[in-house]
């Protein structure tokens, strides 16, 4: 007998299906389900009187033949699509995306459920890949809790704690500090990778940091980012298949942006805060967005451009770069970096896919828990101010959503050589997954999985009779305890360090994963974010011209995903 359900009734029971639309939080962004992998009438759902019971939706297969965990009827939002599916997890990895159930009695089943299978109800939830923040100043370990609670599951950067050097630069300098930080990484339920200090004009001081475990090198103007240092650093990176991140020369002491681009010599490099407020050739570092070898990112304080953006930046910059407001030269240095015109253009360059990534700059002119929020606030602002993208239609913002989710998932993974493990929801990848209620999308995840195990979740009073009574807040779960921690998170290192046996030498508990293919990636590989405009910045007015068009927009006076969701 066939029972017909209204779309509303179906969505309330099994989640939205093909053609249904979902609003992302309180934004103007709507996504539409492009495909439903489940079979109508054969959906699986757990609970009293529901489908996943012995002999019904649960088969008799043994553990080897079934997933460890199934997320049922979830909406997947990833760079490759927006679909409804069941997600299978096995041995800490995504095993399949498809239709779960009992193949002995149900048609179209691609994922068998058994007695060894745990169930996470994904009905009505959105699942994204764990976020990747590639601009971390490791100033305080407490950042990790904030990042994880926001949906970030991988942190890449440098530092040694609240040292003056780390407060300003994302570098873990030298083999001794690298070893200590890699040992510290064993204590945190998040994937970590560290950048060494790249500012040297001879190879050996850099090579020894790569050999000690650095996944790449960071060039920072506060250490002297001269053309000679850039050239040497990129040569070492080419020899070791590691990435280089750069904060260029704001003062133009060692040369102008053209000098820096010339020092690149066509070699791949990740440019941090490419707009320039976070640092870089004033006023025209944005020009590098047009280079095929440059992988450009933003940091989140300028995202998106609002009526408050300029006011907060000056004081923030003075503190982060150890400047003295009573010294005229220090004040001029700070003021040269804060330009409303380039910040406004940054919004549009993100929307058009010229800026490929977004990161935090944690505690050093950036907020570690707001990468995802500010990404989607930027997308919303651009939808309101610029309308639908040409690739989208009047019904949905699917392409825009794919473009923006790629900025903090797959593109950072490709840039830093870790896309073979993380960065997207695809079979074979590490099961770092974030579950969201649509009303709280991008703001407050319901649950964060690390390596297939629940690491953090919104949880009520532990003494209550059920999980939901107040106070509900983020609490660490079992993936963060004991030996499970080391088996559900990864530490990224260089291939050179892995081959040298640092895991045994340092006594590391976490699995180490070498980065790879860092030197082959180009701007063309930045998914949905590969536009290479010819950019000029007027040295007097700071107006930004891209392919002959002036890029400007008004500051936002109000934003979604803000005070509606937070008390403070």
Curated annotation (Swiss-Prot):
Entry EC number(s): 3.5.1.5
Main subcellular localisation: cytoplasm
Binding site for substrate: 220
One of the record's GO cellular component terms: cytoplasm
Pathway: Nitrogen metabolism; urea degradation; CO(2) and NH(3) from urea (urease route): step 1/1
EC class of the enzyme, as a word: hydrolase
InterPro entries: Amidohydro-rel, Metal-dep_hydrolase_composite, Metal_Hydrolase, Urease_alpha_N_dom, Urease_alpha_subunit, Urease_AS, Urease_asu, Urease_asu_c
Recorded catalytic activity of this chain's protein: urea + 2 H2O + H(+) = hydrogencarbonate + 2 NH4(+)
Single annotated GO MF: nickel cation binding
Gene Ontology biological process terms from the UniProt entry: urea catabolic process
Residue positions binding Ni(2+) 1: 135, 137, 218, 361
Cofactor info, note text: Binds 2 nickel ions per subunit.
Family: Belongs to the metallo-dependent hydrolases superfamily. Urease alpha subunit family.
PANTHER family the record matches: UREASE (PTHR43440:SF1)
Protein name: Urease subunit alpha
